[in-house]
Every structure is written in structure tokens, then in C-alpha cells.
């Protein structure tokens, strides 16, 4: 194993936090000066290699492996895809409500959840899991939301009727006993 491959492996595992010069030097039993030379070689290797997406950066004596600037657009698009970014519990709740009650307004969703759902709706719209499906014919004409074809693909189903059936949940006996009034 070369020093370059060892440095690369350590920085890869360290991820976003990176490693300090002192920590790297102690792990590799190198002097700071010798390590600096190895880091410079690694940095030059990445700069010259057009087939590598990586580069080495140093911030306040901490070194990290990051992707080259030219990949920013590609990585931004990747990060926005639902398959590669987990949905929050709130987003999953809203998505479930829309899937089973569509078309439905934000206010109706808020009433079911008991909290504001605007943020979750925005995220689901951005991920193309839901869409605006017209306006409700009431005062204020609020938007109606429904799932998209992409939602069906994401869930691995062909039709909404393939969603699992949700029955009204019966409260457990312990819960019923808890809320009984004692005379």
C-alpha cells in the first residue's frame, strides 16, 4: 500500500468531516512535512486525472476528498430525486393522505394531520410524487392535490386500487380503559 492510497482511503472513510494534518500524520507515522508532500502529490494526481471526479481540499488544516466543481449540476440533480433522498415522516404522512383521499386540498390534509402541511406538499410537488389536480369549487378555490404516474412507479404499482387497504384502526382495550371515567 502506498501512502497515497492510504491517505485516499482514510479521507474517503472520514467523509465530510475530513481529517486534520496532525491526525493523518499520526495514523501514517509520517512527519507533517512528509505528509504535506504526499498530500500535494495526491492533489496533483486528482487535478491531472480527467477520469476522476475527485479533488483534495484543505480548510483550516483539515483535508477532505470532494467532487470536482464540474459535477455540481449532476450531483444537484441526483440529490433532488426521491429515490436518493429520503422523505420525512411528515412528507410520508401527507403522501399517504393524498394517495388515499385524492383529490384533496391542503386544508383538508391539515385537518387530518392537525398541523400545517405546506412544506411537505412543496417537497412532494418538487419530487413529482403529487400534482395540482385542479381547484375545489368552494370559496377561495383551493388547489386539489393528487398523486402522479411517477408516484405509481415509485410505489411499484400500476393503479391506485393496488394500494393496500386501510381499515379504521380500533383503539386497544388499554386505551379504552384509560379514557373511561370512573364514578
UniProtKB/Swiss-Prot annotation:
The keyword Disulfide bond does not apply. Coiled coil: none annotated. GO terms for biological process: cell division; chromosome separation; DNA replication. InterPro entries: ScpB_csome_segregation (IPR005234), WH-like_DNA-bd_sf (IPR036388), WH_DNA-bd_sf (IPR036390). Keywords: Cell cycle, Cell division, Chromosome partition, Cytoplasm. GO terms for cellular component: cytoplasm. The keyword Electron transport does not apply. It is found in: Cytoplasm. Participates in chromosomal partition during cell division. May act via the formation of a condensin-like complex containing Smc and ScpA that pull DNA away from mid-cell into both cell halves. Homodimer. Homodimerization may be required to stabilize the binding of ScpA to the Smc head domains. Component of a cohesin-like complex composed of ScpA, ScpB and the Smc homodimer, in which ScpA and ScpB bind to the head domain of Smc. The presence of the three proteins is required for the association of the complex with DNA. NCBIfam families: SMC-Scp complex subunit ScpB (TIGR00281). This is Segregation and condensation protein B.
Amino acid at each position: 500500500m502506498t501512502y497515497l492510497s492510504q491517505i485516499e482511503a482514510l479521507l474517503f472513510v472520514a467523509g465530510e468531516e475530513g481529517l486534520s494534518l496532525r491526525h493523518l500524520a499520526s495514523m501514517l507515522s509520517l512527519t507533517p512535512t512528509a505528509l504535506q508532500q504526499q498530500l500535494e502529490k495526491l492533489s496533483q494526481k486528482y487535478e491531472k486525472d480527467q477520469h476522476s471526479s475527485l479533488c483534495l481540499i484543505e480548510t483550516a488544516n483539515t483535508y477532505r476528498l470532494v467532487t470536482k466543481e464540474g459535477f455540481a449540476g449532476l450531483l444537484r440533480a441526483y440529490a433532488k430525486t426521491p429515490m436518493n433522498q429520503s422523505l420525512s415522516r411528515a412528507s410520508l404522512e401527507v403522501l399517504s393522505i393524498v394517495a388515499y383521499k385524492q383529490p384533496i386540498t391542503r386544508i383538508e390534509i391539515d385537518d387530518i394531520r392537525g398541523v400545517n402541511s405546506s412544506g411537505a406538499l412543496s417537497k412532494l410537488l418538487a419530487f413529482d410524487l403529487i400534482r395540482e389536480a385542479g381547484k375545489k369549487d368552494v370559496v377561495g378555490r383551493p388547489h386539489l392535490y393528487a398523486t402522479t404516474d411517477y408516484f405509481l412507479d415509485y410505489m411499484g404499482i400500476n393503479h391506485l386500487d393496488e394500494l393496500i387497504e386501510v381499515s379504521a384502526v380500533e383503539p386497544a382495550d388499554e386505551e379504552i380503559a384509560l379514557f373511561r371515567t370512573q364514578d
